[in-house]
Amino acid sequence: ALWELLQAGKLYGDVLTCTGRTMAENLTGAESHDREMIRPFADPLIDRAGFMVLSGNLFDFAILKTSVISEAFRARYLSRPGSEGVFEARAIVFDGSDDYHHRINDPALNIDEDCILVIRGSGVVGWPGSAEVVNMQPPDAMIRAGKQWLPTLGDGRQSGTSDSPSILNVSPESAVGGGLAWLRTGDMI
């Protein structure tokens, strides 16, 4: 896969790596022979699939998982006339996965479809190793009513199998003073 990126000009081949050799030297002879498993860069399985890099006033950068944005999600959150592709939501903020698990069903949070679930303190500093905790579900009552997901935001990571529309790997993370550290439940994002 790295050889494909190098050939497509997406990696700098002349950078020195920890091996003492350049990236190009390390990748010499590393071409994939199974073109169904490692697709050529010019022939992707899905065009424009996967992820998008975002930036804004809450973070310098984060990753938006675009591959799971369904038409239903797009219609509900991203189709406001005059502001297509933009959504506004009320933040429900959790300080790590324990806080999320203890409070997600708290009726005082008043979680509804106009909310975004935020988990902070789960990046590489706040939770060494960067926890896989951004894949949060709505409260049980919403799930029973047929609502399987809400937008999520966090400074940790997420399983590749999660089908939740998510903004993850927020940086700088909250543990080092990033924007999520200042966010409070009820704030509009």
Q: Which sequence ranges carry the predicted segments?
A:
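Catalytic or ion-coupling anion/metal-binding cores of large enzyme and transporter domains
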Residues: 1-189
